[in-house]
Curated annotation (Swiss-Prot):
GO cellular component, one term: cytoplasm
Gene name for this UniProt entry: hemH
The keyword Metal-binding is assigned to this record: yes
UniProt cross-references to Pfam families, sorted A to Z: Ferrochelatase
Family: Belongs to the ferrochelatase family.
UniProt catalytic activity: heme b + 2 H(+) = protoporphyrin IX + Fe(2+)
GO MF entry, a single one: ferrochelatase activity
Naturally occurring in which organism (per UniProt): Helicobacter pylori (strain P12)
Disulfide bonds: none
Enzyme nomenclature, EC number: 4.98.1.1
Domain of life the protein comes from: Bacteria
Function: Catalyzes the ferrous insertion into protoporphyrin IX.
Keywords annotated in UniProt: Cytoplasm, Heme biosynthesis, Iron, Lyase, Metal-binding, Porphyrin biosynthesis
InterPro entries listed in its UniProt record: Ferrochelatase, Ferrochelatase_AS, Ferrochelatase_C, Ferrochelatase_N
Protein name, as recorded: Ferrochelatase
Length: 334
């Protein structure tokens, strides 16, 4: 009987000690296996924030056509990445580090297009009797296609849990934070590895968007341009000159007009220079950074006989980024 009472007391003590606030890192996700490539594409192209066709039937039809045209190519890409996206395991490692550094909160993550979905994560947090939540967008710049889509999904999932009504706060953008930009600049310098910065063209590559989405009021392009200007100011303050500092857009899909210039276009244009690329719109490495920037465009750079072509890693699960997230959460206003 004493043993049973002791175990019950331990459970009560653990419950009392367990954090009452949870931070959910929100990202797009990526296939956790080759089987999930189809799931990933289906969920992405059924998202009205991605494929902005108001008629549900038409959106599903167009989405199915895109999926059928891309699924085999996408599987080959993920085969080259070891059969899955690196995004989920890196995000898991980041939350492990966050929980070690800040045991006063519980850090977890939810993905938009692949498990773990927001609905699954929120059900778990309801069982943990969490009292407050922070939805932390992992996209530095705001866009309806990423940030708003993730928040909409998370809030809808929360509404479906009728008995779980925690207090919710959000972090929807953080690109203007000087501490973040110092980490980015240090990552660039680390990748240069004592090479002279003035010998390189620095390209900040971000995920592209159809121009029609920006024309409809999305602030993404404006925020990306502002982010680059802030980084240029910081480089000037720290006396770190580059041959040129440019912004480009990658991952164009389909025949419609997208934001320009493209990353490919700038690599071609500066073929006589050394090039270093930083993936400015991504915080966690994924197929667009590892395959597109570091494999596909590296082959292009070799064909163009570019002497040095460097690609910076994302912030990933670095201790600097983890500390930045913790500080942003601590400083979040009520």
């Amino acid at each position: 009987m004493n043993l049973i009472n002791e175990k019950l007391n331990n459970l009560e003590n653990n419950a009392a000690k367990s954090p009452k606030e949870a931070v959910i890192l929100l990202n797009m996700g990526g296939p956790n296996s080759l089987y999930e490539v189809g799931v990933f594409l289906k969920n992405m192209f059924d998202d009205p924030f991605i494929l902005t066709i108001k008629n549900n039937f038409m959106r599903k039809m167009v989405g199915k056509m895109i999926i059928n045209s891309r699924i085999e190519k996408s599987k080959k890409i993920y085969e080259k990445l070891g059969g899955k996206s690196p995004l989920t395991p890196i995000t898991f490692a980041l939350t492990e580090r966050l929980n070690e550094l800040d045991p006063s909160r519980f850090y977890t993550y939810a993905m938009r297009y692949t498990p773990p979905y927001a609905s699954m994560v929120l059900q778990d947090l309801a069982l943990k009797e969490v009292e407050s939540l922070v939805f932390f967008s992992m996209y530095p710049q705001y866009s309806s296609t990423t940030t708003l889509s993730s928040f909409n999904d998370a809030f809808n999932a929360l509404k479906s849990l009728e008995t779980f009504r925690p207090k919710v706060r959000v972090i929807e953008r953080f690109y203007a934070d000087k501490k973040l930009n110092e980490i980015i600049l240090n990552t660039i310098l680390s990748t240069l590895n004592n090479r002279k910065s003035q010998d390189f063209v620095l390209i900040f590559s971000v995920h592209g968007l159809p121009k029609s989405i920006v024309d409809a009021g999305d602030t993404y392009q404006q925020e990306c341009e502002h982010h680059v200007s802030l980084l240029k100011e910081l480089m000037q303050q720290k006396n770190i000159p580059f041959k040129e500092v440019l912004l480009s857009y990658q991952s164009k899909l389909g025949p419609m007009k997208w934001l320009e210039p493209s990353t490919e276009e700038l690599i071609e244009k500066h073929r006589k220079s050394n090039i270093i690329i930083y993936p400015l719109a991504f915080t966690i490495d994924n197929s667009e950074t590892i395959y597109e920037l570091d494999m596909q465009y590296r082959l292009m750079a070799e064909r163009l006989a570019i002497k040095e072509y460097l690609v910076c890693p994302c912030l990933n699960d670095s201790i600097e980024f983890a500390k930045f997230i913790i500080e942003r959460v601590k400083n979040l206003k009520e």
